[in-house]
Amino acid sequence: MEENRLPRSEMRPWQYAGAILWLPMHVWFLPRLLLRCLPDLTVGGLNFWSYAIGAGLLTALCLGFLRRDFDRLWERPLYILGQALKGYFLLMASEFLVSILVYAILPQANPNNEAILDLAKAERGRILAITIVLAPLVEELMFRGGVFGLLRRWNRWLAYGLCMLLFALYHTWQYALTDPIFWLYLLQYLPAGYILCRSYEKTECIWTAILLHMLNNSVSLLALGG
């Protein structure tokens, strides 16, 4: 991977801290707090409010970072949109190849995709909001803006490797804890983790990763029949 000579897109120290610390809050503490306060929440409602609260807090915390990178999007929209589209086609191809390998070993549907599809049937509006808008914003600020952005200041390879692994774990851990065979599905999320990091680094604009993530989620949900 060649170094990028564009001015680096970086958060402030407190923004790095907030974006990274929000990851365990989002995964573990906030859902339990919401269920304690609102025990009648549906699964779709729990996910919606977890992402909505995260989107609000992270946007407020990282507003300056988002605005600076939006200026970069505004200055060269065709380049950034083109890189997002390029990333999407690379993502489709790589996920297709990895899926062939995974399904050869474990010929059943990805449980995360199945869960999203079931929720979309029951609570379509909320799941559309989560999948297309809230999740890309929250996840890109946590993973690409926070984890990757901080670690690459010291070691790019570590930044790529750890961010890819955490992103894959984030989408699979709850299923893998019920059956260890589901750890294989980690492989399906590694290409996305890499390509989202690379798209962000190549353009030095977090909006490239956010837009790519939005596009991928939208098409994936449509393909799943959501």
Q: Residue spans of the language-model regions?
A:
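Gram-positive cell-envelope targeting signals
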Residues: M1, R5-A17, H26-V27, P31-L34, ...
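Interfacial transmembrane-helix boundary/kink motif in multi-pass membrane proteins
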Residues: E2-P24, V43-Y51, R67-I100, R152-L158
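Alpha-helical transmembrane segments in multi-pass membrane proteins
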Residues: W14-R67, N112-E114, R126
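Alpha-helical transmembrane segments of multipass membrane proteins
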Residues: W22, H26-P31, G54-T59, L90-S99, ...
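Membrane interface segments of multi-pass transport proteins and intramembrane proteases
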Residues: L35-G45, L106-P111, F148-G161
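Juxtamembrane helix-loop-helix connectors linking adjacent transmembrane helices
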Residues: P39-V43, R67-A135, T178
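Internal transmembrane alpha-helix with an interfacial aromatic "cap," most often the third helix
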Residues: L63-D71, V138-R144
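Transmembrane helix-loop-helix hairpins at the membrane interface
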Residues: F96, I100, A104, R124-G226
